[in-house]
A protein has these predicted regions:
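Conserved amphipathic alpha-helical "coupling/scaffold" segments
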Residues: 1-175, 202-213
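Generic detector of short, locally flexible boundary/turn motifs and exposed helical patches
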Residues: 7-9, 198-201, 227-231
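Residue-level detector of functional hotspots within protein domains
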Residues: 25, 185, 219
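Long amphipathic alpha-helical segments
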Residues: 134-141, 197, 215-224
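Extended alpha-helical scaffold/assembly modules in large eukaryotic proteins
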Residues: 174-178, 182
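Conserved NTPase motor "head" modules and their coupling/switch loops across ABC/AAA+ ATPases, GTPases
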Residues: 204-241
Length: 241
């Protein structure tokens, strides 16, 4: 990525994130994303503009695309996944004897940590299935940015332990055993944590594209202005004293 050099004074002059007179600033137009991480990514796009015309066009084409999907998970589910992945308690490799030995204890005693792990595992499994389905069914005419995201999903899943998770959970309604939950938990929170972070970034990218698309529709904004390499510009009847 090649970024445009900017400074604090430029941000202030353009009223990017704040104004001197409590007026509406630019970011407020596009800050109503559906997720917290999407909002952070949107701010990053605005605060660090690109100077590469090709990359700018990719973003524009993705934003204007009328087939942008609904977010694959809702905000609460995504927040819980983020919380679960950041949760550091009881990270250990799965052992079938330990999993079996703790079954009765888990049935008779409520364990908040176990709740986080069980729900987190189920939501991550659901996330993997949603992303796999989206990447597989992406139409040929999709914008390049969406194709790149789908390719990233395929590269991460193909031939990895995460692909094995998809195969083992083809029926998402099927109850997972304690041992399988423990095995998946170690995989998600330790072995393939960074891969899951990359996969989550696709959801936030969709959020960032959907938000200006929605704003542009509501306010009749132009999504893709005509951009040229060179132009002739002249001013007449202007006097400077």
């Amino acid at each position: 990525m090649v970024y445009l050099a900017t400074d604090k004074q430029t941000y202030a002059d353009l009223s990017i994130t704040e104004t001197a007179n409590n007026e509406q600033f630019l970011f407020s137009l596009f800050s109503k994303t559906e997720t917290k991480e999407g909002k952070a990514l949107m701010l990053n796009w605005i605060m660090y503009p690109l100077s590469d015309l090709g990359e700018i066009r990719k973003r524009q084409e993705a934003i204007v695309w009328d087939a942008l999907p609904e977010l694959l998970l809702n905000e609460e589910e995504l927040d819980f996944i983020e919380y679960y992945l950041a949760y550091r308690d009881q990270i250990r490799e799965a052992h079938i004897l330990l999993s079996c030995a703790t079954v009765i204890d888990r049935l008779v005693r409520y364990d908040s940590t176990r709740y986080v792990i069980c729900r987190g595992v189920k939501l991550v499994v659901h996330l993997l299935h949603c992303l796999k389905e989206w990447a597989t069914e992406l139409p040929q005419g999709a914008p390049q940015l969406m194709k790149e995201s789908a390719a990233m999903i395929d590269n991460i899943l193909h031939g990895s332990e995460l692909e094995e998770v998809l195969e083992q959970t083809s029926d998402e309604e099927k109850r997972l055993s304690n041992f399988v939950i423990d095995k998946f938990d170690y995989l998600f929170r330790c072995t393939r944590l960074l891969s899951l972070k990359e996969l989550l970034s696709v959801i936030y990218l969709l959020d960032v594209c959907r938000t200006p698309h929605r704003v542009a529709k509501e306010k009749s904004f132009c999504c893709i202005p005509v951009m040229v390499q060179t132009m002739h510009f002249s001013v007449e009847g202007f006097v400077h004293t």
